C-alpha cells in the first residue's frame, strides 16, 4: 500500500475537519504514529498505521493562537468590537484567535503568499494582505486605523515595526509583540541553528525592544514569555504595548524576573517543531 501524508490521513479518517487544522494539531505535538510523536505534517505514513491524537485540539488554525490566548490571559487586552491587525499572519493563528474573541475586522499582513488558512481567507471579516511587507503599509492602505494588533515576524527587528504601528493605529491602540532574541541580537550572539540561549542576551534584547516601543509612542506596559518555543527551541517573549503620547518604561526589575522565569519553565520543555 502506498503511503500518505500524515495531515491527509487525519482528514481522510475524520479526525479533523481541514488540512489546516490537521497541520496545527501535528505541530502542537499531540499526534502520535505507532506510539511515536510526529510533528511534521508532511510525514509519509502507511495507511494502516496506528494514529492517535492525544490531548486537546488547540482550537486555532495554528499554534500562534495560543500565544495571543496567553497574552489576553495575562494582559488587559481584548479585541472585542475592534479593528485589528495580525502582523506576520502566516497561517493565521493570531487572526483566528482575534475573530473568536470578537474582532470585527482583521487585516492579516504577511510577506508570504498562500499561507493563510482557507477558513480565514474566505471569512468576510478578514482582509488578506499577503505579499505585503509591513514596512510598506501606510494609513492610506487601510479603510480605518487599527485599535488592536499583534506582531509575530521573523528575520526583521521590531525596530522596523513600531514606526509603522505608530502611524496606522488609533491613539489608544494596544498590541502584543513577540520579541524574538534570534532576530534582535547581534549576529555574534546567535548560536548554532540560530538559537540564543544566554539569559543575558535575552535581557539585552528585551531592553532594546522596550526602547524601540518608547521611541514610537508606545508604553511597554507588560511582559511575559511565550508559552511556545520558537523554531529550534528559542525562547520568545510577549510584550504588551499601549499607544500613548508619553511612554513609560517597564516596571523596574520586570525584565530580569521574566527572563529568569522563562528559562526555569522552558529550558527543559520539548521543542514542538
Predicted regions mapped to residue ranges:
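Conserved S-adenosyl-L-methionine
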Residues: 97-105
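Glycine-rich SAM-binding Motif I of class I
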Residues: 92-93, 114
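A basic, amphipathic helix-loop patch mediating RNA/tRNA/ribosome contacts
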Residues: 1-49, 83-84
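S-adenosyl-L-methionine
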Residues: 107-160
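A short glycine-rich, Lys/Arg-flanked "PGG" loop and its adjoining helix->strand segment in the class I
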Residues: 159-176
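Conserved class I S-adenosyl-L-methionine
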Residues: 80-90
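Short, glycine-/aromatic-enriched active-site segment of Class I SAM-dependent methyltransferases
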Residues: 181-198
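Flexible, glycine-/basic-rich loop-and-beta segments that form/coincide
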Residues: 235-273
